[in-house]
């Protein structure tokens, strides 16, 4: 250190090119102010506080050696494990590695990303809450999964090498998940990347785009799905709307299964299908989105919109079901 001056009346030590160490933290900066009676360091320009796990950098850092709490009133950067953390201001408890910060962006070496207006959580287990204008990106089998919402809670676990690995992401309020041709909306969405699962409840909606560009929109009370297989199970007040360039199909049911890659929509319970030409009610129905073929089973009733009505109720017809090619 150079140009050190101690002001006895103020109990303040100032200097340049500081490099020092307490029990477990190394501190350095171009300019230092040390308030001896309080144990407070003010590090300015190229400031750094480092221990075995964490490196905190900023243009201005404040550190209390008694509490081991570091504060950054200005922009900061933290390097922890495989993660780089950036923020406009924040506080890091060096004893517990608890971080609170504003306008935070977290990036991993795997190109995963989380950002939000605020963050609150512990770095050691990487269980973090992101609050306000949250967005991020994780990967499933190398394919990006993007998400956003008002609030996100991220859970990590240690892998066999002791590295933190994303285990679960909860997204609340205005939640959106996007992967390739699938977009999910809800008040609550949850991703489990390791199991390749997604779960949604409360005002759920799935929008699926097939290879031909046709859009299928599905709403329900609850949904579970696999983003890799693009199979989505829906329960409660299911509504399906499928639009192509020529027509729209509307369907409702109690439950449904969307098999997007197999071009199949399976409707179960109190099924009603309106293809524009007729309204078909049944206990079950399978709709092939590629062939436009609908197969209905169990208590089938067809109401043609040209006022021709046909009830399909005898035993043979119920067993064989009802088949119709839905014209484009």
Q: Where in this protein do the model-derived segments appear?
A:
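Mature-chain termini and adjacent capping regions
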Residues: 1-328
